[in-house]
Amino acid sequence: NGPHIATQAYEMGDPDLKSERAWNGELYARYETPATAFSATLYTNRFDNFIYEAETGDIEDDLPVFQYFQNDAKVWGIEFQASQRLANFGSSDLSVDGVADYTRAKISSGGGDVPRIPPLRLLGGVELTHASFDLRGEVEFNDDQTKTAAFETPTNGFTLVNASATWRPFGRDRNIALIASANNIFDVTARRAASFTKDFVPLAGRDFRVTARVSF
């Protein structure tokens, strides 16, 4: 037991926790052509003796107390990815892509929601690729998370807009690239529902950077 500064929590363990057991099921579909790619996954997990860390409502050393608990639980969700090439201009390709994921996790026998579960997330992007450069813009949407555990605060949804440009001065076959990126262009206040520190530290605001990447 003791304070964990990185998560801003006073954590309490339990030496009597049992081993977890899980039964997992997954349904997966995939389709791919030279111009189109699609995949979707539906999964469900049933846990015996699921171990999780939850807030108790107590304060110790000026930090909220989080304790490890154990109960049966059910987790299910969906994941989706797709990409489509829209056009080809000589050595350049224009394409769009998207990602979606959603997870639900509940403690069995009326135990409520598992803490720190991310909400529905949607991400879409458009990208122009060339032997010497890539241009990309993307939008990421995160829904509100109101399905929370006891003492856990709801999390407001947010939308991030990002853009980047990559230049490969010696072509795609050489592992040298200069990257200019702009993240959270509209400087929105964003908090991840799965973060221990969401109530204290939001995600970074508007951010511009230039980096050099050399791969070996």
Walk through the language-model features, giving the residues of each.
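Outer-membrane beta-barrel signature, preferentially recognizing the C-terminal barrel domain
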Residues: 1-39, 44-47, 57-78, 83-85, ...
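Short, solvent-exposed loop/turn segments that connect beta-strands within catalytic domains
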Residues: 6, 60-62, 88-92, 171-175
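Outer-membrane beta-barrel transmembrane domain signature
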Residues: 154-160
